[in-house]
C-alpha cells in the first residue's frame, strides 16, 4: 500500500464514494479520546501527511457537486488531521469554490489553528459550514482533554463566527466519567452565548487496548442521556447524544435547528414522518433525504397518535433543519430484505447483529421470522473494539 498508485487509488475511492476530501493526516493535537489510538493491529488505516496541492486538485474533479464536500471528517480508513494546519488550506478552499461554484463545503476542525482574523475569508466561500470540536468549556479543559497547545484560540474563534454569521455546529466527546457532568454544563453555558446550529455530545468509545482509566462503563451512556434530556430546556440550540439507540425504522424527528424551514413548518421533536409528497417513507434516512431533495415538500406526520400534514417552504437540495438519527438507507433496507426473502429457498440464512442493534434488526425482519423462512438473527458480542467507535 506504499506505492503512489495505491495511495491515489485509496484517496480517489474515498472522494468518489463518500464525497470526503482528505487533505492531511497531521493533527498537532493529542486528544485522550482520539479514535485513531489503541486500534487492534488488524485495523487497516492510512496516513498520508499533508497532500500536495496538485494531487488535491485532481481529487476535487471526482467530487459530486450536488452533495456537500466533507473536509476533516474521519469517516473512512484514512486518518484525517486538522484541515487548518495544511499550508495550502485557503488555496484549496478557493480552488473548490472556483471549480464547483455551488457545492456546499463542510469542514470539521478543532478550532485551534483557524485564526479568528481569517474568518472573513471563509465568509467569501459560502455556502460553507464548520463543525467545531469544542470538547470543553475553557482552555484548561482543552489542555487536559486534547493536549491543545493553543487552547485559547477556539474561544476567540466562536464569537467571531457568530459575528460574521458563519453557520457552525459543535461537538463534544464526553469524558464525564473523568470530569463529571458539570464541565458539560459549563460548555453548554459558553455555547449559549454564541449558539451553534446544533451540539452533538458523543459517548466516548475505546478499544480494549486503551488505558483502564479511560474505558467507560455502559451504564454511563444512560447517565449522559438523562443529563442531556434534563439540561436541554435551558438552551436555545439542540443538544443530541451520539450514538442514538433506536428500536425501529420510524422516521422520528430528534430535534430542529432554530429558525429553520422545519421549525417554520410547525414540526416538533418526537413527530414521526410517514409520507412526503404522498409517498411513504421507509426510514429516517429516506425521509431526511427526500425532504432535502424536494422543493416545498408536503409532509404527513404523526404526533401523539394524530395524523397531521404540513408544507415545508424550502428550495431543492437545501437543508431542512431536521435533526434525525441515522438508521438505514433504502439500498441497505432492500438488500437486507432481499436476503431475508431468499431464505425461503436457501438453507439457514443468518443475520448477525450487534447487541445494541439486535432488537432493531429483529423488529425490522419480524415478517420473515416464521416457519416459511429459514432465517435466524444472531446476537453477537463486540469483542473486537469493545467500544462505540
Predicted features along the sequence, with ranges:
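Canonical Radical SAM [4Fe-4S] cluster-binding loop centered on the CxxxCxxC motif
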Residues: 7-51
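Core AdoMet radical
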Residues: 38-53, 63-86, 96-114, 126-155, ...
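Conserved C-terminal portion of the radical SAM core fold
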Residues: 66-72, 152-211, 224-241
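Short, electropositive alpha-helical surface patch
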Residues: 86-97, 125-131, 180-198, 253-262
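Structural motif
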Residues: 110, 352-358
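PDZ-domain C-terminal substructure recognizer with occasional recognition of PDZ-binding tails
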Residues: 230-233, 246-247, 288-329
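PDZ/PDZ-like groove recognition
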Residues: 239-269
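Conserved PDZ fold ligand-binding element
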Residues: 262-284
Amino acid at each position: 500500500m506504499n506505492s503512489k498508485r495505491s495511495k491515489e487509488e485509496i484517496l480517489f475511492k474515498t472522494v468518489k464514494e463518500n464525497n470526503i476530501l482528505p487533505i492531511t493526516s497531521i493533527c498537532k493535537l493529542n486528544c485522550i479520546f482520539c479514535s485513531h489510538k489503541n486500534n487492534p493491529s488488524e485495523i487497516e488505516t492510512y496516513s498520508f501527511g499533508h497532500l500536495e496541492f496538485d494531487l488535491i486538485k485532481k481529487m476535487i474533479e471526482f467530487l459530486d457537486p450536488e452533495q456537500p464536500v466533507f473536509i476533516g471528517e474521519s469517516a473512512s480508513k484514512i486518518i484525517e488531521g486538522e484541515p487548518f494546519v495544511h499550508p495550502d488550506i485557503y488555496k484549496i478552499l478557493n480552488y473548490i469554490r472556483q471549480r464547483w461554484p455551488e457545492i456546499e463545503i463542510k469542514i470539521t476542525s478543532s478550532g485551534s489553528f483557524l485564526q479568528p482574523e481569517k474568518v472573513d475569508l471563509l465568509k467569501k466561500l459560502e455556502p460553507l459550514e464548520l463543525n467545531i470540536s469544542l470538547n470543553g468549556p475553557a482552555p484548561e479543559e482543552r489542555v487536559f482533554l486534547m493536549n491543545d497547545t493553543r487552547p485559547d484560540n477556539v474561544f476567540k474563534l466562536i464569537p467571531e463566527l457568530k459575528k460574521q454569521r458563519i453557520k457552525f455546529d459543535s461537538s463534544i466527546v464526553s469524558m464525564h466519567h473523568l470530569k463529571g457532568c458539570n464541565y458539560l454544563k459549563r460548555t453548554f453555558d459558553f455555547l449559549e452565548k454564541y449558539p451553534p446550529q446544533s451540539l452533538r455530545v458523543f459517548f466516548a468509545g475505546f478499544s480494549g487496548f486503551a488505558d483502564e482509566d479511560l474505558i467507560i462503563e455502559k451504564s454511563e451512556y444512560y447517565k449522559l442521556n438523562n443529563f442531556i434530556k434534563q439540561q436541554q430546556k435551558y438552551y436555545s440550540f439542540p443538544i443530541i447524544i451520539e450514538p442514538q439507540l433506536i428500536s425501529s425504522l420510524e422516521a422520528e424527528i430528534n430535534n430542529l435547528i432554530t429558525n429553520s424551514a422545519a421549525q417554520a413548518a410547525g414540526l416538533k421533536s418526537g413527530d414521526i414522518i410517514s409520507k412526503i409528497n404522498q409517498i411513504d417513507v421507509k426510514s429516517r434516512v429516506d425521509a431526511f433525504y427526500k425532504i432535502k431533495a424536494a422543493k416545498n415538500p408536503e409532509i404527513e406526520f404523526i404526533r401523539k397518535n394524530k395524523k397531521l400534514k404540513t408544507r415545508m417552504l424550502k428550495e431543492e437540495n437545501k437543508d431542512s433543519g431536521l435533526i434525525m438519527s441515522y438508521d438505514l438507507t433504502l439500498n441497505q433496507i432492500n438488500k437486507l430484505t432481499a436476503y431475508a426473502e431468499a431464505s425461503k429457498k436457501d438453507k439457514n440464512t443468518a443475520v448477525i447483529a450487534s447487541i445494541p442493534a439486535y432488537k432493531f434488526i429483529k423488529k425490522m425482519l419480524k415478517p420473515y421470522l416464521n416457519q416459511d423462512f429459514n432465517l435466524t438473527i444472531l446476537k453477537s458480542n463486540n469483542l473486537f473494539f469493545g467500544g462505540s467507535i
